[in-house]
């Protein structure tokens, strides 16, 4: 072992076996400990200050881990795991990291008992597969029987640990209305909820309960000129990804003029090129022009004369969303394949009304009743920028949860109910296995209890007592068919006792639970498979050679 841990012929260090495994487990546990205290409805927030002094205050696991500058490769795996969970599901980022770290810790104990990592990996895969099957067969609640209340309760459960949890009813209703507003049916006839098309704007000032849901797409811009019309009915929208400014010749172009009068003609032609472009756009019937670039005063005059509304400096992501909602095509150039410039009427989008209104304290442009898809916008108010940013993250998580519930039409009880039920089931399942996987499945079952345990600790309750009571209820539910309704029992963290979370309305999307189990298991297995770490030294600029000499000195080339 000592020989292996010396310098290598490749200018690096190698460590293997138990050393690497211990390092990986420690790194994973460190990452999990950072986010552990932010789990649950009474979890605490983290303040992160980056290298230039920007402050972020958040409770969101994915945001915390994204802002950490982690060096250890095993810790990076967990940070990427939280990012993956956030991208795929949108919620459950903290719990997925905690479960993965606990699985690793317990697998390390098995390795120390001389059980081969391959046996543990096999057991973990089997346990994960059984756990997902058990959730789908026994623990899901169909949302059709619960209706809108189920959606609101799922959103409230997601918000409960966040800054907007205190006004959960208000924001949950707003989020459900926003998600329902953007519903459309795809080609297969299935309902889809593209929550990315919901624009979330932030304005600091006033209280968070003065946030509003706006019917239509709210654009944080104003018309280009005061003389323009502020309202257009039956709007035909042109989405342009270039500037409408006086054309100037590129640098390096040289024009030799013998007659001074020709200079004015060149200037006139520069103006005419842009004028012709605007006329081509207006000739198609366009009366609302949105562009990501600038529009100079000369061009604005043409739009004012034509009675059209022109908006400049629109963000590209907003332009793409508006194009999708209105049925427009984003145009990045007017040039066609023949080298001519043209603009087709088919590239225009349509909306019932485009109007500039004063919403809260700001002037916004609202695009209402778009033709291709409906759209909605949420305008958040808060005391300061930190609060508004955290509210936006919380709304994003809640929107993702509502989308998942609407699309999958199933939820599971929250508050540690699923983890406790799976723990009891997998312990019993492990005893039916005759192979070495039995120990790994039992450790998997024990690892899941970290979620109810952490929830209780964060709520300043007696974790040992609460988790023991919870396990007793779930054991009774699985052993005694007459009392199977006890499977909905989870933790009431405010009063510090178990309760029926189905009646209490504490719900989470089934997808959050199943995906987090799968992702956590795969991440733990990825790190568990590692038994060798070779770390190369960064190459210094002044030391070009030296590899061979270092290798001879270390004895790595001796037989």
Swiss-Prot record:
Protein name as catalogued: T-complex protein 1 subunit alpha
GO molecular function (one): unfolded protein binding
Main location as per UniProt: cytoplasm
GO cellular component: cytosol
Source organism (scientific name): Paleosuchus palpebrosus
Keywords on record: ATP-binding, Chaperone, Cytoplasm, Cytoskeleton, Hydrolase, Magnesium, Metal-binding, Nucleotide-binding
Compartment annotation: Cytoplasm, Cytosol; Cytoplasm, Cytoskeleton, Microtubule organizing center, Centrosome
Enzyme class: hydrolase
Assembly description: Component of the chaperonin-containing T-complex (TRiC), a hexadecamer composed of two identical back-to-back stacked rings enclosing a protein folding chamber. Each ring is made up of eight different subunits: TCP1/CCT1, CCT2, CCT3, CCT4, CCT5, CCT6A/CCT6, CCT7, CCT8.
Reaction catalysed by this enzyme: ATP + H2O = ADP + phosphate + H(+)
EC number(s) per entry: 3.6.1.-
Residues given in the record as Mg(2+) binding sites: 91
Family per record: Belongs to the TCP-1 chaperonin family.
Function: Component of the chaperonin-containing T-complex (TRiC), a molecular chaperone complex that assists the folding of actin, tubulin and other proteins upon ATP hydrolysis.
CDD domains, sorted: TCP1_alpha (cd03335)
InterPro entries the UniProt entry points to: Chap_CCT_alpha (IPR012715), Chaperone_TCP-1 (IPR017998), Chaperonin_TCP-1_CS (IPR002194), Cpn60/GroEL/TCP-1 (IPR002423), GroEL-like_apical_dom_sf (IPR027409), GROEL-like_equatorial_sf (IPR027413), TCP-1-like_intermed_sf (IPR027410), TCP-1_chaperonin (IPR053374)
Keyword Hydrolase in record: yes
């Amino acid at each position: 072992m000592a020989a292996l841990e010396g310098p290598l012929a490749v200018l690096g260090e190698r460590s293997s076996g138990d050393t690497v495994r211990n390092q990986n487990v420690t790194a994973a546990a460190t990452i999990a400990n950072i986010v552990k205290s932010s789990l649950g409805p009474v979890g605490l927030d983290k303040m992160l200050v980056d290298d230039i002094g920007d402050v972020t205050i958040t409770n969101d696991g994915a945001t915390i881990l994204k802002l950490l500058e982690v060096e250890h490769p095993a810790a990076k795996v967990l940070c990427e795991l939280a990012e993956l969970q956030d991208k795929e599901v949108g919620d459950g980022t903290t719990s997925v990291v905690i479960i993965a770290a606990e699985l690793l810790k317990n697998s390390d104990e098995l390795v120390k008992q001389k059980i081969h990592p391959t046996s543990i990996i096999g057991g973990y895969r089997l346990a994960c597969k059984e756990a997902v099957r058990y959730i789908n067969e026994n623990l899901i609640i169909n949302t059709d029987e619960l209706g809108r209340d189920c959606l609101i309760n799922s959103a409230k459960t997601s918000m409960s640990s966040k800054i907007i949890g205190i006004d959960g009813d208000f924001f949950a209703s707003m989020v459900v209305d926003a998600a329902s507003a953007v519903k459309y049916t795809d080609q297969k006839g299935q309902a889809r909820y593209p929550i990315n098309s919901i624009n979330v704007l932030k304005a600091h000032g006033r209280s968070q309960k003065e946030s509003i849901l706006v019917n239509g797409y709210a654009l944080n811009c104003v018309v280009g000129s005061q003389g323009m019309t502020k309202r257009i009915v039956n709007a035909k929208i042109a989405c342009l990804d270039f500037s409408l400014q006086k054309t100037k010749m590129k640098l390096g172009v040289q024009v030799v003029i013998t007659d001074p009068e020709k200079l004015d003609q060149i200037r006139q032609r520069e103006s005419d090129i842009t004028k012709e472009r605007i006329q081509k756009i207006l000739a198609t019937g366009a009366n609302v022009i949105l562009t990501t670039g600038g529009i100079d005063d000369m061009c604005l005059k043409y739009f004012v004369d034509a009675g059209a509304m022109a908006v400049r400096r629109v963000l590209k992501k907003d332009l793409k969303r508006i194009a999708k909602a209105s049925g427009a095509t984003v145009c990045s150039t007017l040039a066609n394949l023949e080298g001519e410039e043209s603009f087709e009427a088919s590239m225009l989008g349509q909306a019932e009304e485009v109007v500039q209104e004063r919403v809260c304290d700001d002037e916004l442009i609202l695009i209402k009743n778009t033709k291709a898809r409906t759209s909605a916008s949420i305008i958040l108010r808060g005391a300061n920028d930190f609060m508004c940013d955290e509210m936006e993250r919380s709304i994003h998580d809640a929107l993702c949860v509502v989308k998942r519930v609407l699309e999958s039409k199933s939820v599971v009880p929250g508050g540690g109910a699923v983890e406790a039920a799976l723990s009891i089931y997998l312990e019993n399942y492990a005893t039916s296995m005759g192979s070495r996987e039995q120990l790994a499945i039992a450790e998997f079952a024990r690892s899941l209890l970290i979620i109810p345990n952490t929830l209780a600790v964060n709520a300043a309750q007696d974790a040992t007592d609460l988790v023991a009571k919870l396990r007793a209820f779930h054991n009774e539910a699985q052993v005694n068919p007459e009392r199977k309704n006890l499977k909905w029992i989870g933790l009431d963290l405010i009063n510090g006792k178990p309760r029926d979370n189905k009646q209490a309305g504490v719900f989470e999307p089934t997808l959050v639970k199943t995906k987090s189990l799968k992702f956590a298991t795969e991440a733990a297995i990825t790190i568990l498979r590692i038994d060798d770490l070779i770390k190369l030294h960064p190459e210094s600029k002044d030391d070009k050679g030296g590899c061979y000499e270092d290798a001879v000195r270390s004895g790595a080339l001796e037989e």
